[in-house]
Amino acid sequence: MAPILFLQSCLSDDDYDDDYLAICPIDQPNALVTVKPNADNTGFIMQLNDSTTLWPVNMRQSPFGTKEVRALVNYRQATPSDIEKGSATSGMPCVFVNWIDSILTKPVVEGMYSAEENLQIYGDDPLEIVDDWTTVAEDGYLTLRFRTRWGGKAEHRVNLVHRTDVNTPYYFTLYHDAQGDTEGQTGDALVAFKLADWMMAPSDQDYATLTLEWKSYSGTKTAQFKFRQNKGNVSSTSEGH
């Protein structure tokens, strides 16, 4: 897993026409989406958040095949000319994709071992969770931007394990195995974890709380995320300590 260079997210230009998306440098991502292709990848949509789905008028197929993935994207609102040249669908905002790049997307691991065994299996190397717009829980995924040291000598591995040995609902630990590659420059990377279907099942409450634990360079830390169960989505509200 290679580190990713991150740039600041763009800001709106108050003088820009509201009928089109606010100005953003084309080399910067302006959204984090879930790419959802149909069964034979003859079309796909991009889930922007809990309630907004986007239709890419200038792309017929997902560049990632039939696999559902999280991705960084730079897009703008489609113009009438874009729609005329491409395709449109009723009831869905149409956008023009400038570029899109997938991030590592993995399932959650169901815990079957003790805390000590987990460390041996999944690794015990430190990392930091970066609190920015890409660290978010939404659309059935927990997406994390993390920071660690990269020496370029080995592929780092990260896993999110559901801790069934902890008496707290929806308790997860993020494990990092640097495979001995613990010296080098500090860099960031993104990873997204697909929350299990049982977590998304409808319940009496709209939201539940997910607790995330990880080993940082200064000791064990935790953060909490509220996720929406009854719509299969997750809210972006989070808090850490």
Predicted features along the sequence, with ranges:
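C-terminal motif of bacterial Sec signal peptides marking the signal peptidase cleavage site
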Residues: 6-9
